[in-house]
Every structure is written in C-alpha cells, then in structure tokens.
Amino acid sequence: MSQEFLARILEQKAREVEQMKLEQIQPLRQTYRLAEFLKNHQDRLQVIAEVKKASPSLGDINLDVDIVQQAQTYEENGAVMISVLTDEVFFKGHLDYLREISSQVEIPTLNKDFIIDEKQIIRARNAGATVILLIVAALAEERLKELYDYATVLGLEVLVETHNLAELEVAHRLGAQIIGVNNRNLTTFEVDLQTSVDLAKHFKDDCLYISESAIFTRQDAERLAPYFNGILVGTALMQAENVVQRIKELQIDKG
C-alpha cells in the first residue's frame, strides 16, 4: 500500500465520515478482554483470524464465502479474536459483516478499517466490535491519542498498528497495550516478515505484540513465535482449502 494509495483511502474515509450519522451509543457486547487473554496465555502464539473477501493488493480473495460460517470455524478451532474488514470501496467489506459475525460468536471481534473519526468508533461498538484498529501512519500523533482515549472511554480495546521504528515509538508514547506490526512496506507494497523480527528488538516488556500480514505457513509462525503474543492472519485462511488444518498449523506452542 503506497503512501499515495493510503492517502486515497483516507480521502475516501473523510468523505464517508462527512456523510455518516452520529449514532447513539449502544451497550458494549460482552466477551473477554483481549489484552487480559493474551497476558494469561503466553505459552502459545495466538491467532487473530480475519474475514476478508478482497484486498487492494490481491484483488478478489474469496467473494463467495459464508462469512458467519467462516468466523465460527475460526472460533471453534482456537482463534482468539475475529478481525472483520468493513471497508466497502477497497476491501469489499461491510459493517453488516461485523454486525452479523459479532452476533454469532462469543470471542472478541476487531473492526478492521481506516478509522479517523469518533463516529466510526461508535459505529464499530454498536455493530458488536470490542476492539478497533488505529493505524499510526494514518493519523497525526495528537489525533491518534484523541481517538485512542475516546475508544478506551467507550470500553473498547485498541490494536495500534505500526510499520517501522518511528511508528512503534509513537505507539509506545501513546501507552498502547496491544501493538501490531504490519509486515507490508507502505512505500513499495512488498511484504517481509523480517520487518516484525527487526522491530522486536525494540519491544517493551509491558506491551503485547501482534504481527500482521504475509503469514502463510507454520514456518512463518514459528519464526515469529519467540517475539510475538499473536499473529493476524487473513489471506492464508480465506484461501485455504482446509481452514481447520491451516489455523491449527499457525498456533505455535511455545512450551
């Protein structure tokens, strides 16, 4: 995702937010706290499993998937959380997917989108999300803090996504509990697991870390297991002929 492409996405989001109604806040869906679960289950590399029909880099991935059945298969086979793409224009997602999945699973759900405004946070919570994504590259640091604090007041957890050391330092200054490292280079569009391995040298003991993107095989997961609490996996699961086998392969016991 080039910076130019990220800018296009953010321009689209700004247009969407302008048209978006401010919803009344509904009760928070009850499930366990992701951070607490990750802290208490550090003997395993946990899998956050994603429901994603398409992406800008790959195009259509799996348009015919039964999203609820896919999410329930994830849950039944050890996923710690379901990530749901809700961006319509670039990822062929929908807020209804989040609403449907959240109503049919017991575990936390993550609203995976480009969040730039409080209205989106309320909307995510009302649709059943208990965790939202905030992307450091998409927000000025002051605005990132405003949205992080707002989500926290609403009882939501936040996955703060980073791509490089400067962004990781922003996440640390923010006091983020759960920090993601996206292995996709924003400038070249290339993905490299070494991004996660390199940034792990700068991790703090009191934070929880999730590696995102480009994780396909058990070998990939084993490479990340020494450094991370969890991995976020989408394409590998959406393309898998045997979803159960694939998700089991990615859950690494650390012993």
Swiss-Prot record:
Database matches in SUPFAM superfamilies: Ribulose-phoshate binding barrel (SSF51366)
Keywords in alphabetical order: Amino-acid biosynthesis, Aromatic amino acid biosynthesis, Decarboxylase, Lyase, Tryptophan biosynthesis
GO molecular function: indole-3-glycerol-phosphate synthase activity; phosphoribosylanthranilate isomerase activity
Disulfide bond found in the keyword field: no
A Gene Ontology biological process term: L-tryptophan biosynthetic process
Pathway assigned in UniProt: Amino-acid biosynthesis; L-tryptophan biosynthesis; L-tryptophan from chorismate: step 4/5
Catalytic activity: 1-(2-carboxyphenylamino)-1-deoxy-D-ribulose 5-phosphate + H(+) = (1S,2R)-1-C-(indol-3-yl)glycerol 3-phosphate + CO2 + H2O
EC number: 4.1.1.48
Pfam families the UniProt entry points to: IGPS
NCBIfam families in alphabetical order: PRK00278.1-3, PRK00278.2-4
Homology family: Belongs to the TrpC family.
Name this protein carries in UniProt: Indole-3-glycerol phosphate synthase
Source organism (scientific name): Streptococcus pneumoniae (strain Hungary19A-6)
